[in-house]
Amino acid sequence: MALVFVAVLVLTGCGSGGASSQAPSATVLYRFGVVGNRGAISQLQLDRPTPVPGISGQVVQIATSNSDGYALTSSGAVWAWGVASYGELGNGEHPAYSTRAVKVEFPSGVRIASLANPMPFDGALAIDSQGHVWGWGLNALGDLCLSGLMEFRPSELPLSKVTLATGARTHSLFSLGGKVYACGSGEYGVLGTGSTASSSTPVPVVGLPNTARVTALTSSWEGSGALLSNGDYFNWGYNAAGQLGNGSTADSAVPVHVDLPAGVRQVFQGGSGPKNGQTMAILADGSVWAWGENGRGQLGDGTRVSSDVPLRVEVPHGVTFVKVSSGGYASYAIDRSGRLWAWGDNKSGQLGTGSGTTIATEPVSVGIRLTQISSTAQNVAGLQGSTRRP
């Protein structure tokens, strides 16, 4: 059983009130859902938010992997919590799991600037202030671009001047020098090289137009994507349920264009298994579009029918979404006022509604306000409060 929880990070004491010399209060982490460990019989069921101690400093970014959560603070430190058997906590230890956040141990002088989001399923990636990438955790498929099977502390990848990174169950993607690189398993063409060959070293993705820069990378279990500065979005990899969004169900080892309305602002891929996955895209007008597997209602269009082309999510009247995220069989959005909405599968409480509803095919209010949301598989983290950057 993997560690599954929904977490809410509540940032306190970071407003403009009080003396300017006062340090920000520590971040408080809450979790609920099912907490367990791989292969463990016992598990902890939490149906109400429960604090997780340990994070110190002002959190500026959050990220999730299959069984872990990560928080980057304004000082460049990274904190981790969750399953630790593969070294995912990055502190040299590997207990079953940790419900308390622990500090990831980078070499002296390394200051992290951003986290991959989502993270590799059983590992983690972070970009430092110099553009170097660090990875830790499980590297069984070469998806961390490292040579070892497991890394219990961060190791530097053979990449530099990296601006973006994202990970999944089988592979990772990086943007540097105007190009996109990938490593890991090449099954279904997920590396985007034109073949299904695997590579434990970074290889260039082929077929992306060079007329616009890459502004975001997306990934799911066996899918990849890139959003360009002109609003064009491209997918590649597995496609049996229409995950590529191009009107086909044929896999593609090269990027294919997804026909979306103008004004795409954010895209997020989800999926927790080798044969599922969905993608959410949010436009400047607040509308949300989704495509791919829909067996649990995760597309949010009121049905449970998969789609190989983008469909419009049934957004409640008067609500404008500004951020989206997508996990295993569930999807999430934050509206203009900060309210969190969720839809899809809820068997592990990952919708966070506290209700007995097992499936929601349209967005439902979670009853909490957030500024950031991240989800991977059944693991969700949210940040509440002001930060120094989005």
Regions found by a protein language model. Name each.
Residues T50-Q58, K103-V110, L115, S155-S160, ...:
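Short loop/turn motifs that recur once per blade in beta-propeller domains
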Residues G15-G17:
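Bacterial signal peptide processing site
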Residues A23-P49, G82-R100, W136-R153, G184-T201, ...:
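Short glycine/serine- and acidic-residue-enriched loop/turn motifs that recur at repeat junctions
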Residues R31, D68-A71, A80, D122-A126, ...:
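Conserved core positions of repeat-based scaffolds
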Residues T361-P390:
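Blade-level signature of beta-propeller repeat domains, shared across WD40, Kelch, NHL, RCC1
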Residues V10-G13:
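C-terminal motif of bacterial Sec signal peptides marking the signal peptidase cleavage site
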